[in-house]
Amino acid sequence: QWQVHCLDVAALPLEQTSDKDKQLIIIAGVGGELLVELVRAILAQHPLRHLEFILCPVHHNYYVRQSLSALGLGLKSEHLLEENQRFYEILHVSTIAAPNCLPITATGSLMWQTLDEASLPRAHSYLSQVIGHYQRMPAHKQTPEIIHAYQQQLAQLLSEYE
């Protein structure tokens, strides 16, 4: 049985369900900073619950991934989606990290490992776009470690398909 709620996610009435029930919360279409705030609020309200999230931030994926990792969440799956010439990272994460989850990495892991050769141009385009985005930032806002991390991811991806 499932229910849809349209309300402040921190106010989700999870206490009305059994502690044994698994809860899947979907948050999509919001910026990365807000998405992290929402996940933090849910975890603070329900610290002992087994929760799973499907998350699709529209910006700040690097920040989102670092924050989710810092919150102790584990990665169940991740996918790169392209729609209307925009890219989206979709993350399925869980509060129960082991044994079926992986650590959440800052630039992605599973979504690159499951690529086939036909998907390589899309992945290359996405990573190039992300690198370009960070390189265009004003010098005082640039974060060389983020640029370097995505450049390494792109180089690794390209080397695997040579």
Question: What residue spans do the PLM features occupy?
Answer:
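S-adenosyl-L-methionine
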Residues: Q1-K22
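Class I S-adenosyl-L-methionine
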Residues: L12-L14, L24-I27, E33-E162
